Amino acid sequence: MLIPCAAAALTLGSSMMAFAATGWLQEDEIWHYYDRNGDEVTSSWKKSGNDWFWLDEDGEMAVSQLVEDNDNYYYVDESGVMVRNQWRELENDDPQDDDEPDTVWYYFGADGKAYKAKDSGRVNFKTIVRADGATKKYAFDEEGKMLYGWIDEQGERQTGDDAWQTGLYYLGGPDDGAMRSHQWERLDAVDDDQTNDEFQDWYWFYFNANGKKAADTKKTINGRKYYFEEYGNARFSWYATSSNASVATPSFYSPIQDSWMSVGWFKTVPGENTDPAGYSDGEERWYYAEKDGDVVKSRIKKINGSYYAFDEYGKMLEGLYKLEVSDKDILSCTEIESENDLPEDGDTEEVYYFGGNSKAGAMKTGTTTLDIDGERYTYNFRKSGDERGQGYNGIEDGAIYEKGKRLEADKDEKLKKVEWDGETYLVNTSGKIQKNKKNAKDADDRYYCTDSKGIVTYEGMEKKSEK
């Protein structure tokens, strides 16, 4: 801390010129003062030139010491001159706590009086220009000692483990004392109620223009959003704005390093309270938060030209899923990891695929080949409209699709009958509908005939005659 402490002090040798029996008199190298009656002056100030000097109870001029006079405190330097408009670091001869430093700071104003607390019962800050030209605010106790660390509304220092909870202002260390305002501070905190494994015995705090810590509020600072708890610590990790939060409750995430509400894309481990199963997996997942910090959940959302889906906990979906969707809201969500997970005819879910391109998790449209239980399948997903991303149901590009999967014959079948919309179609190993076929033969030597739509008109072990 830069504290102005250089004083231009006149020495007695230059300011006291010569003294008669009345006035200043040096005896045994100690200065005394005698009034016009010849009486020695004690416990009083006397002026010489532009400077004031203190005569103690023995009539000796005081040097290098703190002087108490009429409930005010002054300091005289090594020449006995009253110090004015200066900081002084003095021995702490009356420590109140074991953790107090050996020295304390005082500031002496233009009248030489040490700044000290008023009797109003509220903290009183003094504005002082430091040696570096910066203007800062400081507070002092009733004896003029500069306060530091956490203090409350009354200007009392808070020194226990709960100081960060009971304190309202923060004034830095013992050699600092400047009130924090418009400023962040990362401060040590003992919090036995904190169960998050990320907690490292400190919190971020923000101090407003009036020096008071932000508490129990959401605040935008330099374009970033933060949520401050009851005692002013900026929240970190996962949290919801309601004590009885459910998966439907808006949730937020703030990294511990800076504690701002994440906005846009971020990657982290799911929260222990917001997503217990995901937390147990311990795998980092992608999330997306709106401008207000609210994490997108149970929704398909367009982001930077691509569509993404998020489950009920806000995790970005990656892979093949069956979803029940209503106006971009996801009502149900199940990952398809095996053929047993595929939706059945009549199910309300539709199949979507997220990934498979340069943007991880982006909704896939058009055709793609996917592996399910070691088998390769061709899927086709709608490219536009309200059903964008859904797997096709029906005939598209000369093939039949069911929940996006192309229906086709196995290689060892060559041809296969497919039931669709009340009709029986014939498809090959590429899923192509076989139209206008005459006696097409499958791997079992069974013959088929189809019409112009590919609907089977004949099936048998014998060729159909040309009659």
What residues fall within each predicted segment?
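Extracellular adhesion/carbohydrate-binding repeat motifs centered on closely spaced tryptophans
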Residues: M1-K467
